[in-house]
């Protein structure tokens, strides 16, 4: 009899505390006026509801969960009660990651994050100084790098993350050197989502061939002390995917939307992913269990037969499914409204893994 315990199921909550931000990045997926923000008591109630639901799932299915909270914005450091929010999340046993532009981080904030504790911090960095400042605003590069150094000094694990487009994809080697020189432990990458302000950059999206070339190059780097990571499901389909060293990473189970994660917006609205901004409920008024089980949107995301184009025929569907947010945003740009279309940057053959 096999008594081996099942592996913990990685499940993440991405909680956006605010859509306020001190920057106005050209590729940002946010649009429109900032919504109402949940109060600290409302956030505490939401976190408890999430925790209770995950505990119930674990007992019902006899599978241990490894839940994580990605806390972000907007710029989460604009919340004056951030410390209290993080403590509420930590007290429920969640692993916490903070996603920030890094420009507001100083010694005191770094010490606070380390004391919670926050497990890791992602700082957005789009390339060398002139490229980063073109995308995120003059002076933001220096502030972000200084913020990362404060985090490292406080003993936190730091990831630089670059949003790839034709504006900055050619600078990936520079980012390797920059990240290694700054002493960060990880360098991550994702793709431009042509949504919100980012919709104006649709002409800067990488072609499928360019996407593949950049990903192959990125995952082939071997720099002591620096790990290459990404949440992009397409990365798992590159020829380098099987050669990743320990500490490097990409999603083995494909796009997380509807499968292994959910997003909570500042007012409590639930969506499959922040960049796939289709409301499916509200954490303050709806049962997370009911939303997860019965949402038509989530169930469509889990059904291969509902997908369109290459994704509907692909032998790698269960390991990839493309980025649903990019597929959706691209469909909107073409006058459609379909989150189940094929990923427009897909570079894999439908019948085979590369």
Predicted stretch roles:
Residues 16, 37-41, 115, 119, ...:
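Radical SAM enzyme [4Fe-4S]-AdoMet core and its adjacent flexible, acidic
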């Amino acid at each position: 009899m096999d008594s081996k315990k099942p592996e913990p199921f990685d499940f993440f909550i991405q909680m956006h505390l605010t859509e306020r931000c001190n920057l106005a990045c050209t590729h940002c997926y946010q649009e429109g006026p900032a919504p109402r923000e949940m109060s600290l008591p409302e956030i505490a109630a939401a976190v408890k509801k999430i925790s209770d639901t995950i505990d119930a799932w674990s007992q019902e299915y006899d599978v241990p969960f490894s839940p994580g909270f990605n806390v972000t914005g907007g710029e989460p450091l604009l919340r004056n009660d951030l410390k209290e929010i993080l403590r509420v999340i930590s007290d429920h046993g969640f692993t916490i990651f903070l996603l920030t532009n890094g420009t507001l981080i100083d010694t005191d904030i770094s010490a606070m994050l380390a004391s919670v504790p926050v497990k890791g911090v992602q700082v957005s960095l789009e390339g060398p100084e002139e490229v980063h400042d073109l995308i995120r605003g003059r002076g933001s590069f220096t502030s972000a790098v200084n913020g990362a150094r404060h985090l490292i000094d406080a003993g936190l694990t730091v990831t630089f993350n670059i949003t790839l487009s034709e504006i900055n994809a050619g600078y990936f080697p520079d980012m390797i050197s920059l990240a290694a020189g700054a002493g960060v432990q990880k360098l991550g990458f994702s793709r431009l989502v042509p949504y919100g302000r980012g919709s104006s950059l649709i002409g800067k999206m990488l072609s499928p061939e360019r996407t593949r070339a950049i990903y192959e190059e990125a995952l082939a780097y071997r720099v002591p002390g620096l790990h290459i990571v990404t949440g992009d499901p397409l990365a798992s389909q590159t020829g380098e995917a099987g050669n990743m060293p320990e500490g490097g990473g990409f999603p083995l189970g494909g796009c997380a939307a509807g499968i292994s994660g959910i997003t909570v917006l500042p007012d409590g609205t639930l969506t499959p992913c922040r960049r796939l901004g289709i409301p499916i409920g509200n954490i303050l008024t709806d049962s997370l269990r009911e939303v997860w089980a019965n949402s038509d949107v989530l169930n469509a995301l889990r059904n291969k037969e509902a997908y369109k184009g290459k994704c509907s025929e692909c032998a790698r569907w269960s390991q990839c499914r493309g980025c649903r947010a990019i597929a959706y945003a691209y469909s909107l740009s073409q006058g459609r409204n379909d989150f189940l279309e094929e990923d427009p940057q897909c570079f894999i053959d439908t019948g085979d893994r590369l």
